[in-house]
Amino acid sequence: MIELRHVSHHYDERPVLRPLSLTLRERRIGVVGSNGSGKSTFARLLNALLLPAAGQVLVDGLDTRQDPKGVRRKVGFVFQNPDHQIVFPVVEEDLAFGLKNLKLPPAEVEARIGEVLERYDLGEYRQHPSHLLSGGQKQLLAISGVLVMRPEYVVFDEPTTLLDLRNRNRVAAAIRELPQTAIVVTHDLDLLRDFERVLVFEAGELIADAPPAEALRVYRERMTWP
């Protein structure tokens, strides 16, 4: 369970997230809003990429201020641009890096890497140069790099924005099939059809928190204002 208690945030005294309290328990949660609405700030607060200016973010009881490393072990984060996460020249090296930091036995490292590569049909690319992967393959590698660490929650920030339709569908399927809780910031409303809950942000405020049909109705109405 992720809990926000009276959380707010600002940049240079400009409020970007107004006081917010809520609890996230559902397995699939979408987050939408126009550019600058506060949705990406909200996402980054969930795994301690940002710390709140005020209030508390608790992940299974861990406070992001007091134990940010512990929170990041529980909450993985997938960026919009996979190049922000792919730092090694070979696919296998990229997946192994975080696991070696955990000081796992070599057999466990090998098993985890094999598992994620098989899941996303990347097995034949194990020794492939990372920069030669397609856009969709890079995003799947970024997701694999998070999942190989076995977090309990995964936050996605616009995971399909840079992809063509074919690769968008591959990444959308990967998100749907995740065993972990997924919290997805997106403009791709079709991605959210089967989600349990959608949060709508506008100008730093949460203006809707409902099942997809109701939340997206509010979002579309706001987006079509004159």
From Swiss-Prot:
A Gene Ontology cellular-component term: ATP-binding cassette (ABC) transporter complex
UniProt entry tagged with the keyword Transmembrane: no
Superkingdom, natural source: Bacteria
Chain ranges of the ABC transporter domain: 2-225
Enzyme Commission numbers on file: 7.-.-.-
Keywords of the record: ATP-binding, Cell membrane, Membrane, Nucleotide-binding, Translocase, Transport
Keyword ATP-binding appears in the UniProt entry: yes
GO molecular function list: ATP binding; ATP hydrolysis activity; ATPase-coupled transmembrane transporter activity
SMART domains per record: AAA
Positions with a binding annotation for ATP: 33-40
Membrane-protein topology: Peripheral membrane protein
Main location per the UniProt record: membrane
Pfam families hit by this protein: ABC_tran
Family: Belongs to the ABC transporter superfamily.
Function field: Probably part of an ABC transporter complex. Responsible for energy coupling to the transport system.
The protein's name in its UniProt record: Putative ABC transporter ATP-binding protein DR_2469
Taxonomic source organism: Deinococcus radiodurans (strain ATCC 13939 / DSM 20539 / JCM 16871 / CCUG 27074 / LMG 4051 / NBRC 15346 / NCIMB 9279 / VKM B-1422 / R1)
